[in-house]
From Swiss-Prot:
Keywords: Stress response. Signal peptide: none annotated. Residues 72-88, 203-215 have a biased composition (Polar residues). Residues 78-190 form the sHSP domain. GO terms for molecular function: unfolded protein binding. GO terms for cellular component: cytoplasm; nucleus. Pfam families: HSP20. GO terms for biological process: protein refolding; response to heat. This is Heat shock protein 30D. It comes from Xenopus laevis. Residues 63-92, 176-215 are annotated as: Disordered.
Amino acid sequence: MFPLSLLQPSHSPLCPCSQSALTLWPATRLIFGQLEDDILSMRNDLERRMQRVNEACRLLSQDTEMRRITDQKQQSRSPESEGTSPNSGKVGKDHFELMLNVRDFSPHELTVKTQQRRVIITGKHERKSDTEDGNYFHEYREWKREAELPEGVNPEQVVCSLFKDGHLHIQAPRLALPPAPETPIPISMDTAPRDAQELPPDAQTSNAEGEQQMD
């Protein structure tokens, strides 16, 4: 017959494990909460960094595109730009005129002035735009053309007008010269023989010496 102590079920080994699991669960949940917060913080920081990278790429793309468009415009206007070099204005019978393409500039960005006998046209464009991360985009463009005024044009009478299509028209009237008065030209009498006038001085001297020897 077995002793009674062997027949009684014993749960003593399981009790310490259950108590340890109940004791460690709050600490484990706290650790997982901290890890989750750290992961969220790292994710937010990564998103902010990605936004800055995207903003920088967008600005770089805009700058590259604007440079490409500007180069294309300059290449497309190269014949006209050559036509705006000094002494390139059209000189008519009664006026002087010059046509320039300034559609890239607004009226308040253009300046037209005369300096001695030259017409100087300048354009300056500047634009700044702020970004979301506190940076800014700066664009600056400067353009200049000169033309020589021909003789007979008064620099003080130069006028200019800007058309809606972006062309600047510069013109000035030519001064009307008074007609030359009728002036009689007197005829002077010369007593020297015509043959002697046509001979060179050396020939005339040799002829005179020959005549003296014959005498």
